[in-house]
Regions:
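Acidic donor-binding segment of Leloir-type glycosyltransferases
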Residues: 1-34
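Short glycine/serine/threonine-enriched helix-capping/active-site loop
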Residues: 4, 35, 85-90, 172, ...
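Glycine-rich, basic loop-to-helix element that forms the pyrophosphate-binding segment
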Residues: 35-51
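Short aromatic/hydrophobic "clamp" motif used to bind/position activated sugar donors
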Residues: 56
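The conserved acidic donor/metal-binding loop of glycosyltransferases
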Residues: 60-64, 89
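Conserved donor NDP-sugar-binding/catalytic core segment of glycosyltransferases
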Residues: 68-104
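Conserved nucleotide-sugar donor-binding catalytic segment
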Residues: 111-199
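Membrane-proximal basic amphipathic "stem/tether" segments
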Residues: 219-268
Length: 268
């Protein structure tokens, strides 16, 4: 386990908790990397540099692994060790933060938003991997580098696009984790605006990348897109932005989101 503290309440503010965990014997080895406030990309890259295992997986401090998360993903990867990565499903948890100090919050709703089998053209268009859902080979970091320091947002999307250029990913259709999004409309709008601003920046970086495909692989991609009857799907983020910014639709957003989540589960 590698724990990177990005600033926190002063450098090494988590040291006591780490030492207590070490002394408990619950984990064989814990690597603690305290940093001054440096940002997500620096913290993620430091974690990858410190990691020594063959497989890696990220976990932000407000996300949650279920007890079988790593077991499910590792077991699937062992069946096909040539895969660059495997990823599972995750609940998006709408969270109402009542207080940050002390930390008090309420989980408002769980929704299953992303259920997309691996498809490169779709990934080139928009991200459908919550960051904690992906278990990947560390050699991808060694071969392709880590997070792009120019991106303070959508850095994970850029990482997965680069890692998947020469490596296949595979979906494991089981929910094994959760991630949080703000419940308050104002915070949701602010968050979406930031992501929208970074989309063009991340896309511009992707346009400089090159991918090598065989003729059968190109044919397969064309057939898949044709079968879907779309060039590339309209991103969920765009639809969400339209709904939230339309007063008549705004009040229907969360009920519709819940209904769609239930309908998807029934259909599957």
């Amino acid at each position: 386990l590698v724990v990177v503290e990005d600033g926190g309440q002063g450098v090494e503010s988590a040291k006591a908790a780490i030492e207590a965990l070490r002394s408990s014997g619950a984990l064989a080895k814990i690597v603690y990397v305290p940093l001054p406030k440096s940002g997500r990309c620096v913290a993620g890259n430091k974690a990858l540099e410190a990691a020594t295992g063959q497989l890696c997986c990220f976990l932000d401090d407000d996300d949650l692994f279920y007890a079988d998360h790593l077991e499910v993903l590792v077991s699937e990867w062992l069946k096909q060790p040539t895969l660059g990565a495997v990823y599972s499903l995750s609940y998006e948890v709408r969270t109402h933060v009542q207080s940050e100090e002390p930390w008090v919050y309420q989980n408002v709703m769980h929704s299953l938003i992303h259920r997309q089998p691996f498809h490169r053209p779709t990934l080139w268009h928009h991200n459908y991997f919550p960051i904690q859902t992906v278990l990947f080979q560390r050699k991808l970091f060694e071969e392709n580098g880590g997070f792009d320091l120019d991106l303070e947002n959508l850095e994970d999307w850029n990482l997965w696009v680069r890692y998947s250029l020469k490596n296949d990913f595979k979906l494991v259709p089981k929910v094994t984790s959760t991630y949080r999004v703000p419940d308050q409309i104002e915070k949701a709008l602010q968050r979406q605006a930031v992501l929208d601003n970074y989309y063009a920046k991340a896309k511009a970086k992707h346009d400089l990348l090159k991918v090598e495909l065989t003729l059968p692989e190109i044919q397969q991609i064309v057939e898949e897109i044709s079968h879907q009857n779309q060039v590339v799907g309209v991103p969920t983020s765009w639809l969400k932005q339209v709904v939230i910014r339309t007063p008549l639709l705004r009040n229907l957003y969360h009920p519709l989101k819940k209904w769609v989540s239930i309908w998807r589960r029934i259909r599957r």
